[in-house]
Amino acid sequence: MQTVETLNEGLKRAYTVTIPANDVAQRVEAEIKSIAPQVRMPGFRPGKVPANLIKKMHGPAIEQDVLNKTVQDGVQQLLAEQKLRPAMQPSVELVGGDYEPGKDVALKVELEVLPDVPPPAIEGLKLERLSVEAPTDEIDAQIKRIADQQKRYDDAKDGHPAVEGDLVVLDFAGSVDGVAFEGGTGTGMSVELGSGRLIPGFEDQLEGIKKGESRSLNVTFPKDYGEKSLAGKAAVFEVTATDVRVPGETKVDDEFAQSLGLQGLDQLRELIKGQVEQELNGLTRTHMKRKLLDQLAAGHDFPVPPSMVEAEFGQIWAQLEHEATHEEDPEAARAEMEKDRDDYRAIAERRVRLGLLLSEIGQQNGVEVSAQEMQRLVQQAAMQYQPADRDRFVQYLQQDPMAAAQLRAPLYEDKVVDFLFDKAEVSDRTVTRDELEAAIEADDDTIGKGHVHGPGCGHDHHDHDHDHDHAAPAKKPAAKKAAAKPAAEEAPAAEDKPAAKKKAAVKTEEAAEAAPAPKKAPAKKAAAAKAEEAPAAAPKKAPAKKKAAAE
């Protein structure tokens, strides 16, 4: 194989690679011999079909397969001989277009290489850890929230008119144009006024109703109502309130905690305190990590492959486009995005540079994700799928190294960050939640924040065509879907009663709901904030495109 370098400019490289026709011919003959035992042809015993007949019948397909493999091997040999580390999938073209049997194979190979990352300066890092003690009032508020979710109702006084929050128990009979319809009649249905569970206007017309009172409710089914025969139609419901109940106050005590499957109130408080502390510790780490990356970015400046920056920018932009579609005014959101296009490109460049830097730090210092850690990641990810699909998901990861790299990358990055935390000089300061959140928000406002993006991060820099959609094979199992909202919540149903309280199961569900949800950042800030949470890893060798030979 002959190699001629045609471009060496910055990180860009280009080569002409010539593979002698004799090498291809020898590979074709070897392939024919290897498949001959499996070829079946009328008139010949199995494995005894002459090579010339095999070539006559299957020659073009064999030559194409051999050519593809020859091109891949040629590119691999080029990368090894020239000691190249591709940033992205090399571009491989046949010089002159189609391959002609009997002639040399001439390839044009173009690529960008990873830069030589300068020795990372990781000595003398100084970080401040902003810590927040779990506030008692926040713990109390979370417990009250749980108590409020465990609603109980007491009998209302005689003559009490139902108001929002009250529970009205109804017998009902619905009709359209005077004709009863299926599912429109029932008894003992409980309706919490103001819950919005029933069709528009139904609950509103129950306000003020008293026990024993009957009313006629005029409503219109929504045009997108699940039962097509009722969609958009006007209906009349004759209802009678058989009972009106008022919310009772849930007393927060040992008995309440025991109803959740706990030993007592002290255990509930400890459980909630632990959840609040976990969330606050996460905020502390987020702030520290961003400050760490700021120092690394400020102390290291080296060229990064434009193709990696462009691919990273494409991902950022796609995420912003997705978020814009959910804004009240998508066009205005897109216009705002366009104003900041250059800023987002700067974010992309920072991501790539930090990714390469963290990857280098991890490799130099022996940071690894162990087989046991990877196994736990796979098991956790598999739980997102239906039980019947979990084995297929695991097989998918085993067959697709890039999918496995995507799964592994965040943990690898966290381990590199933890390594740097251990090396840094860390000072502690106790602050309030508001002060910590304000510090994080100030980071969000800083242009240039971005998740770190390096080789092996799950974005394919050189192992396949880099289109960044990362679509899984057709047989990749689908993730679990949320259960559809039952039709009973859109119209009265005979058996629509409040669910009974759960005991032990409530323990984890209520505790999970007790933790406050993080505030949602505006689209621009969210894109920058998310930046600090992505992966870096070591580069891999790059096979050539299989389709290159056919192009």
UniProtKB/Swiss-Prot annotation:
InterPro entries: PPIase_dom_sf (IPR046357), PPIase_FKBP_dom (IPR001179), Trig_fac (IPR005215), Trigger_fac_C (IPR008880), Trigger_fac_C_sf (IPR037041), Trigger_fac_ribosome-bd_bac (IPR008881), Trigger_fac_ribosome-bd_sf (IPR036611), Trigger_fact/SurA_dom_sf (IPR027304). Residues 165-250 form the PPIase FKBP-type domain. Residues 542-551 have a biased composition (Basic residues). One of its GO terms (biological process) is 'de novo' cotranslational protein folding. Keywords: Cell cycle, Cell division, Chaperone, Cytoplasm, Isomerase, Rotamase. Residues 458-472 have a biased composition (Basic and acidic residues). GO terms for cellular component: cytoplasm. It comes from the Bacteria. It is found in: Cytoplasm. Residues 513-541 have a biased composition (Low complexity). Its EC number is 5.2.1.8. Signal peptide: none annotated. Belongs to the FKBP-type PPIase family. Tig subfamily. Consists of 3 domains; the N-terminus binds the ribosome, the middle domain has PPIase activity, while the C-terminus has intrinsic chaperone activity on its own. NCBIfam families: tig. HAMAP family: Trigger_factor_Tig. This is Trigger factor. It comes from Rhizorhabdus wittichii (strain DSM 6014 / CCUG 31198 / JCM 15750 / NBRC 105917 / EY 4224 / RW1). The lineage of its organism: Bacteria, Pseudomonadati, Pseudomonadota, Alphaproteobacteria, Sphingomonadales.
